[in-house]
Amino acid sequence: MTEKLREISLDTETTGFNADQGDRIVEIGCMELINKIPTGEKFHVYINPERIVPAEAIKVHGLDNQFLKDKPVFSQIARDFLGFIGSDPLVIHNAQFDMKFLNSELRRMGISALDNPVVDTLVMAQKMFPGKRVNLDALCRHFKVDNTNRTLHGALIDANLLSSVYLHLTGGPNHALDFGELEDAPGKQAPKKRLSRSMRTRVRTASPVK
């Protein structure tokens, strides 16, 4: 009997880029994957960040102060969030960013940092497609994942798209990798193309990113 591997595709939206300088999470979206396939089980919540959301951040995700003011604060949703992810691997695009914010929120509550294994799909894509643009939109275009509903960043939408991209990055349903379709990253010339031997990374305490 095949062993079931449970993973969680995860994304967050925030008030900015700097958790160390007081930026907070405003949305968490998670999708359950069993053997890389979404089950339909999800965790999704909007969060009152207990601070003003800057206009620059609102332009990214559309979550303004009026919308968020009556939403629960992180400490009110933490138990449900931790219960949903358990100790299973987290699949995140640019994992350092999200992990730093999640651990910052947990630290405010006196809870230790997450020690779940983390699969960083950004690292995977950079190794698969060196020198190419590998943001989520670029990968959706490359793998022909429909992202027409992604007019703004949204944690649940992005977690759902990421689950499809992850399936392709790990071999997909009989998917043949084509390295020629992605755009070159700015100022970079693609080196010789090769696949990495290991695509998994573990993050305990994230460092500043973006």
Predicted regions and their residues:
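Acidic, Ser/Thr-rich low-complexity intrinsically disordered segments
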Residues: G187-K210
